[in-house]
Amino acid sequence: MVATKKTKKSTDNINNKLQLVMKSGKYTLGYKTVLRTLRNSKSKLVIIANNCPPLRKSEIEYYAMLAKVTVHHFHGNNVDLGTACGKYFRVCCLSIIDPGDSDIIKTTPGEQ
């Protein structure tokens, strides 16, 4: 029960940091643009929803490994990630180019 509260709090923390990035930073939404930013070495952090198709997920992780970029696996599905970004559509993956006022890159635990 305590672990559930901690997960909920960390999810809220990531959601708040994502909202701050959406207001003050630069980002791209979507699979094709995430791959483009990874190939051009512009991305600083990639966030992937947990229901992203496995082939897409592995391809994004491969390009992120080549570009030495941290990948964070979001604990919600693509609808939850879209809502956390403040959008009214589904977001499977997003790339943060400039975090702006947010410290999401320093505090987000990433898996590569």
Curated annotation (Swiss-Prot):
Which InterPro entries does the entry link to? Ribosomal_eL30, Ribosomal_eL30-like, Ribosomal_eL30-like_sf, Ribosomal_eL30_CS, Ribosomal_eL8/eL30/eS12/Gad45
Alphabetically, the GO molecular function entries are:
RNA binding; structural constituent of ribosome
Q: Source organism lineage?
A: Eukaryota, Viridiplantae, Streptophyta, Embryophyta, Tracheophyta
Q: Where along the sequence do coiled-coil regions lie?
A: none
Per its record, how is this protein called by name? Answer: Large ribosomal subunit protein eL30
Q: Which family is annotated?
A: Belongs to the eukaryotic ribosomal protein eL30 family.
An example of a Gene Ontology cellular component annotation for this protein is: cytosolic large ribosomal subunit
The organism is: Zea mays (Maize)
Alphabetically ordered keywords of this record = Ribonucleoprotein, Ribosomal protein
PROSITE patterns to which the protein is assigned, alphabetical: RIBOSOMAL_L30E_1, RIBOSOMAL_L30E_2
Q: Name one Pfam family in it.
A: Ribosomal_L7Ae
